[in-house]
């Protein structure tokens, strides 16, 4: 990636910037003209909190979230989201009034699995899928299928690089 094509975009959050690089980027399922680097958002606590605050604002008290399923190394942001959701008194169905933060195991065919110890964190739970970005939707579709297969309900899909997905069918 060329540094001269990179720049920062200030967001409405004081601790949050988008780091963007213009160019031509190829992925397995498509091409993109811009790369948004979310490494700092995923690793720096102040930025993770700012992202979490923005994402939590889309969920009101009628959205029940029991588990946050992390894709793309989003555990720090998920932890901040869970902290904000539980502090705000959001409902969940877990006996201890806490939110599970879970990362799936990826198998060779591109599917996600959960072992015996973690499958219980999906079964009968309302699961929010958290990812860094949505380009083609393939990975999020695989995650949604896994949640349904293990007996969970997809409560929503959140991404640090996608503001809102309208009319999504779970």
Task: Report the location of each language-model feature.
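Conserved PRPP/pyrophosphate-binding segment of the phosphoribosyltransferase/PRPP-pathway fold
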Residues: 41-119
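Nucleotide donor/acceptor-binding cores
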Residues: 29, 66, 124-126
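Active-site-facing substrate-recognition patch
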Residues: 1-64
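Short glycine-rich loop/turn motifs that provide flexible caps or phosphate-binding loops at active sites
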Residues: 28, 69, 136
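Residue-level detector of short coil/turn "hinge" positions at structural boundaries
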Residues: 32, 92-95, 154
